[in-house]
């Protein structure tokens, strides 16, 4: 696979330091990038909130909607896949030095490819790792080391245009509502459509560089 992709950054505008750190990281790179800021937790309207029920906080709703809008933008673009980052996950030297090697090994029919350990610090266990192997197929079943399914939080992941459109359409179905966060919902959709999911190990993006903003 080539590295012709765009980076979409889910960003909460009040956190200006995060944007600066992200821009400092990306400015010298060859990648185009875009800050997704359409949905602000401080002023979501009733239309924004209509897909959610229960006691989910507006911060999680805004985050969820931001990922969904990234899927929309990718599905309407000329790119075959994109990298989605949350604003606490700026790439560092390891990402730039290794991304080409990882993408060359990633199957072309991938659906999602998680490249950070996420806020839950999920890793492929040492007993499952193989020498020189960097890309691992992740089953959609819960595990003690990998959470409730195939997602790996939502801090840093590639997604293909095909499956971005599927997730976008699933969210926008007339009957759809949810009471959960984007990464938990991903697991439901991954299972429903048998989306091929892969994890990077070693990871390419370090997360948890800031206190949680949720």
Residue ranges and their predicted role:
Residues 1-85, 89-214:
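An acidic/histidine-cluster motif and surrounding catalytic segment
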């Amino acid at each position: 696979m080539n590295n012709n992709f765009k980076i979409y950054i889910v960003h909460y505008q009040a956190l200006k330091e995060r944007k600066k750190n992200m821009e400092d990281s990306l400015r010298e790179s060859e990648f185009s990038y875009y800050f997704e800021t359409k949905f602000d937790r401080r002023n979501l309207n009733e239309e924004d909130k209509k897909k959610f029920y229960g006691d989910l906080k507006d911060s999680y709703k805004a985050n969820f909607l931001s990922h969904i809008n990234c899927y929309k933008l990718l599905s309407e673009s000329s790119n075959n896949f994109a990298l989605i980052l949350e604003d606490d996950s700026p790439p560092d030297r390891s990402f730039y030095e290794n991304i080409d090697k990882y993408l060359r090994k990633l199957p072309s029919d991938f659906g999602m490819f998680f490249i950070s350990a996420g806020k839950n610090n999920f890793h492929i266990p040492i007993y499952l790792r193989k020498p020189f192997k960097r890309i691992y197929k992740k089953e959609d079943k819960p595990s003690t080391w990998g959470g409730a399914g195939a997602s790996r939080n939502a801090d840093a992941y590639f997604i293909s245009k095909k499956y971005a459109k599927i997730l976008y359409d699933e969210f926008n179905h007339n009957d759809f509502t949810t009471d959960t966060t984007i990464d938990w919902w991903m697991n439901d959709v991954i299972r429903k459509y048998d989306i091929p999911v892969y994890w990077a190990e070693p990871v390419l993006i370090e997360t948890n560089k800031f206190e949680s903003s949720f």
